[in-house]
Amino acid sequence: MAAWGLFGQSAGVLGLDRGRTSLMVQAGNKYSGMFAYCLPADPSGTGFLDFGPGAATMAAVAVKEARQTPMLTYKGPRYYYVGMTGIKVGGHLLPISRSVFSAAGMIVDSGTVITRLPPLAYRQLRLAFAKDMAALGYQKAPGWFEMLDTCFNLTGLQGIVLLPTVSLVFQGGASLDMDATGILYVANVSHACLAFAANNRNSDMAVIGSTQQKTYSFMYDIGKKVVGFTPGAC
């Protein structure tokens, strides 16, 4: 079933959550409750979706690189909750209390395009990112739709575009260091926008969307209750 959204068209949705109708619940024993996927940076690129043994290989890599975090049960067992503890911009940890992230919980969801953050966290992120972008000489641009409000004009730039690094930090110290395509959403050359958005309220559930997951292998081990991620997988 095709579906349209603000960021384009999808062919359909494959349910991999922990709800009763999910493929992982219906065939979980066959695949040992494990799956992994990688979303490519380029729409024409090749990603993958692995179940069972293939996902176990990804899990071993995530453990070796210390890039895994506990899978939490926050407001029910359906979603894949994780404990986010901080955000770094340019290698510097932003002044955001951990309680801001734990207030409503955070899930990993490949069906959501843009990551949603509590307003208090998003405000610190956009301020730090805009400051670093200004230091690099980029010109600000008007927002693109209501959701993306921190945009820049890249007209006339050639070659590699340098960006401040952005990292999400999780329980256990695991760090998701964004690929460049996970930092900016380029609507067009005059509108390259910070690919994060604020929820309406700090009490709204936060979401790590597919844009921020690009090029990483995301591994889910339901039995061990861990989520792992490995960079440069596709």
Where are each of the predicted segments found?
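Short acidic, glycine-rich loop/turn motifs
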Residues: 41, 89-91, 168-172
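C-terminal helix/juxtamembrane-tail motif
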Residues: 74-78, 87-90, 211-214, 219-234
